[in-house]
Amino acid sequence: MSSPRPSTSSTSSDSGLSVDTTAYPEESKYTSTAPGAGGLSDENRYRDVEEGEAGADEPFLPSAKKQAASGSRTSRLIWGLVILCVAGWLWGLVLFVTQNRSAQQSVSEALQSHESGAISGSSSSGKPVTLEQVLTGQWLPRSHAVSWIAGPNGEDGLLVEQGEDQGKGYLRVDDIRSRKGDATSQESRVLMEKAIVQVDGRTIFPVSTWPSPNLNKVLLLSEREKNWRHSFTGKYWIFDVATQTAQPLDPSNPDGRVQLAIWSPTSDMVAFVRDNNLYLRRLSSKEVVPITKDGGADLFYGIPDWVYEEEVFSGNSVTWWSGDGKYVAFLRTNETAVPEFPVQYYLSRPSGKRPPPGLEDYPEVREIKYPKAGAPNPVVSLQFYDVEKQEVFSIEAPDDFEDDDRIVIEIVWGTEGKILVRATNRESDVLKVFLFDTKARTSKLVRTENVADIDGGWVEPTQYTWFIPADPSNGRPHDGYLDTVIHEGYEHLGYFTPLDNSEPILLTQGEWEVVDAPTAVDLRKGIVYFISTKESPTERHLYQVNLDGSNLKPLTDTSKPGYYDVSFSHGTGYALLSYRGPSIPWQAIVNTETDELKYEETIEDNAGLARMVDSYALPTEIYQNVTIDGFTLQVVERRPPHFNPAKKYPVLFYLYNGPRSQTVDRKFSIDFQSYVASSLGYIVVTVDGRGTGFSGRKTRCIVRGNLGYYEAYDQITTANLWGEKPYVDETRMSIWGWSYGGFMTLKTLEQDAGQTFQYGMAVAPVTDWRHYDSIYTERYMHTPAHNPNGYDNTSITDMTALQQTVRFLVIHGASDDNVHIQNTLVLVDKLDLAGVQNYDLHFYPDSDHSINFHNAHRMVYERLSSWLVNAFNDEWHRIADPVPDDSMWEKVKRSLPMLVN
């Protein structure tokens, strides 16, 4: 990480922490301060969240009045016993009433007795954040996705807008230059007048639209049905802009469900996939030409299978048109050897099929081809379709990986039939880049990187390689491409030219990293735009650099913390710049033609969100870092409103901590963690431990082969540091996470064995990496055959250690197609065998990894909230070892409800 900017921060030592002490307005994401706050005294500035209530160490006892001397020792003894009995009865009554009232109140009502007072970042009369607001998205910033599109003749600054807008039509192409005034550009046009379309007497309600490159046609999708996370099926239609009429994509099969449809660059053809076969529709006729014919349950053409969709492409397409429309490249995926995993649905029918009569009460079972770690992977190969010759062909690659050891991660078309193919071995630590020539039908290996030898790490399956065509008049005599390369322990931009050159021109370097780069390239000016962490691992700023590596400079304000992303117009003359935090997010269209960004139009200022911030008592976020074993790790601490440093607060740790992930960043966010701090009054801490991204390869790659060990150590060490703080109650500490965070919760509790964390909440956890999919798992763990000890070490196996915690909670969706319920069931069996009972378990029927079937999503968070309150109220201590009690005291307690009611 680069040093903090001296103008805004300094570094100090606090309990072994290296702390970023930036002034509050830049420390917190929220800068709304109530008027008059500065006039409060130190005594009044901090208010106890539960001020006025009896503290845990100050039990309510009635004051004893001095009794007159009776002269009789017996009398004094009797009166003393009577007083003690009455006092005991009153104490029991108080406890019962308090507990009964607490049980009847909601979690928020029970714990949000805030005293009014102003602090930095919170309104003096502010209301606490509610769970309802978080779950219904009321705190989400408004944002707009701009769909930039190239004009038919390469015009720049055009964008597609969908939705009724003051009679301007449903689907429009607008010229950004005409939006500021009343003038209408020649390039602005209406593509669809209305949101509904009539086709042969049928009413079509499009849910998605894709204009053709020449803007004369629009591809429409209706009746969309979800498949997996990114994939779906639907019915497709071709809409004619001139006549405002539509026809089926396949006139001979209008009701056929299509899995993918893509325009050709020449706007006269559509490639589409149905029933796992690839087809071509020429708009000049109604005929549909099958490109492949043997697709089916085990063979996929043009679309990914489950594991490639989830772990490689994060999308539903593995079909790529060449720029001139003469070729279609696509992947052939053979799943024949991949084992199946059954996912059961007890209430729903994802297939849409009714069961046969008499079988209505049986669950629907969906058999998914799911390769677990060590199991056979799908065999993937690249094929091509010559549009003119109407033939499918393949090109053999020299020095290619074997079929069972190949993962194709990216395809990039160049010019003149050239195509770059990036592939890795099964364990994702050797990268090979091939150059194919579809005209000559030849190929060669142009680059190999053995990442295992470089730093012991892995190759992430990203798709950001950018082809740079030759332009001798502009200083580019040869074709080339931009790719991310490892340089001195950090990921930077490299420019490879000619295409077969294996040594790049470094465009960036230093102890920081580029992120999903490049973002855009201005070929006319020879400028590369990219987002990076140059200022801080938790920030994102926009930069530009020339193709020769000169003139690197920021385009966003780096004088203060910021988190930006950007999307450029087709010609890079304009961009949608999105500021995500730490202050109120905004979006603006900017002009990039000048040396400095010129703001053309603000399209979102989130004024409503700003008003909410002024009205609510939000947590204060303190960004810090800790140094553990020489590694600098980013931390954010969320303090409750009216934070009182003299009070002892419970602490909840929230984590994800998956490889290359990031949770601690400067984006504006009001989420479940914010609710816990604001409404429940607890401190919430997140530390991005080793293995997470954007702090260099050394920090990231150390976890390879032993997931969970260093990450858990970092959580425990940080929790111990927090436990030493005077305002932290080290006897009430919990940790929670979802998915990889669920695994990390259990792994941390296992490694800690109750020494630091008393509680934990794990949602949809992996408990044994042999149960998770091969491509993700083996990237970080190698194969089970290669690393058997690593798999043993990283599994949740020490039930005795889990028994040392006070209590933990495990939640899982019963129909999770990603992290199978098998993970939790295997864990439960281990707990049963060990006789461990200090846990709670809840399953949600028919819910996948997101747990949202029926009312499940709300119920998950309500359960997490109430369970956490019970934990920090010491309820789990009370029920740890239940025994029958028929004493007189218990009988009196059981009689109290009648007296109360």
UniProtKB/Swiss-Prot annotation:
Region Disordered, residue ranges: 1-67
InterPro entries on file: AB_hydrolase_fold (IPR029058), Peptidase_S9_cat (IPR001375), Peptidase_S9B_N (IPR002469), Serine_Prot_S9B/DPPIV (IPR050278)
GO (cellular component) term, any one: plasma membrane
Topology class, membrane: Single-pass type II membrane protein
BP-aspect Gene Ontology terms: proteolysis
Residues with glycosylation annotation: 334, 625, 793
Biased composition (Low complexity): 1-22
Pfam short name (any one): Peptidase_S9
Reported function: Type IV dipeptidyl-peptidase which removes N-terminal dipeptides sequentially from polypeptides having unsubstituted N-termini provided that the penultimate residue is proline.
Name of the protein: Dipeptidyl-aminopeptidase B
Origin organism lineage: Eukaryota, Fungi, Dikarya, Ascomycota, Pezizomycotina
Gene from which the chain derives: dapB
